[in-house]
Amino acid sequence: MNFNYKLDNEVLIVSLEGRLDTEAAVKFETELAEVCKANAHSALTVDAAELEYIASSGLRTILKLAKTEKNFKIVNVCSSVYSVFEMTGFARIINISKALRKIDLEQCEKIGFGGNGAVYRVSEDEIVKVNYNPATDAELNSELAKAKEAFLQGVPTAISFDLVDCGNGYRGVVYETIKSKSLGETIQNNPELMEELTDKYIAQLNLLHSIHTANPVFGSMKDNYRKQVENASKHLTEEEGKMLEMVLDALPEGDILVHGDAHPKNIMIQNGEMLWIDMEGMSAGHPIYDLISVAAILSGVRNDDKMTMAICGMDVATVLKFRQCFVKKYFKTEDPEMIQRYDSMIEALRLIRAVFAIGFNSQNTPQMRPLIIQVARQAFFPNIEKIVGAVKYLVNTL
């Protein structure tokens, strides 16, 4: 077996090649000890991309490293070697990650896009959601974990498979292909089904919100909003930052499972069944967080049909009709006065989502931020008492 090493920002990276059998393990342990002694480091990473085999003696060498090195991990492990780590329990006590499957995006059809990436069709049965923003790569692992756990909790979701290497430093998550259209697109193409589909959509929201969870994989939705306030406040006056804090204070913690971006393009219809997609924001919280995300699209996007279609699958006119239908059915009222009252609250929630976007971690945020701040100063901050009041009322009502 051969190995080489390099020091990168105090991380000692050791690359293995060949077979770590009994003879090789003794030699490797001795030589690596000298390398570690001669190169001051704060972390040790073993790159096992070219490691073909590991014997029990090799495992013991790895275990010694895990015990003596403060920040130790093994990356790019092939399937056969990873299975050894799994069977022996090493994968439970050491930070070990498998080599990612590689996908060539040039051979895939681009079928969608978003703030931090795009969606490509890998095959008839698989799509890959690619992240173009390396700063948020860590969120991909979180998204995969959330998608799998939500499925196990009984949430109707697209089945997630694995994390993949998409080339050029990009990572992605592979999902099953949903052979149908989104709820938004279905309503757009079948307006006569709007009422029926809205009923089913609300039933899916209620099903999701019937699930209580303490699983740490989901995290707190209020914490997510808190981070947005912290980021947004850097671009606002002190007084404006305090107004965002007023909204944050009115938003509750909770243990109810919420999607975080529950608009009609994030729910697909396949063989009559509605399935949630894009679950990176799924967290524990309160139904108002999903109502905020729905409200965000209920006026269309800047009265622009093309942009509105891209975001939620419907044109502006259809969105406005859907808004009326949704408000009546979600709040279970036919009273015109109550409908108008709830509609004004939806507008307040829409403004919250828009203004909190000042603190989003998206590639598009820097160019959009000046416009959002302008809108905030025209419509949000002057009406802060009304907006906070709407939040408090809905928190107690939902």
What are the roles of these predicted feature ranges?
Residues 110-216:
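ATP-binding pocket architecture of kinase catalytic cores
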Residues 337, 352-398:
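ATP/Mg2+ or Mg2+-diphosphate-binding catalytic cores
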Residues 1-30, 48-50:
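STAS-typified acidic loop motif
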Residues 22-94:
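Amphipathic alpha-helical interaction surfaces in cytosolic regulatory modules
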Residues 111, 118-123, 245-289:
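Active-site acidic catalytic loop and adjacent metal/ATP-binding pocket
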Residues 291-334, 349-367:
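Active-site activation/catalytic loop segments of kinase-like enzymes and analogous catalytic loops
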Residues 210-260, 264-265, 270-271:
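An alpha-helical support segment within catalytic cores of ATP-dependent transferases
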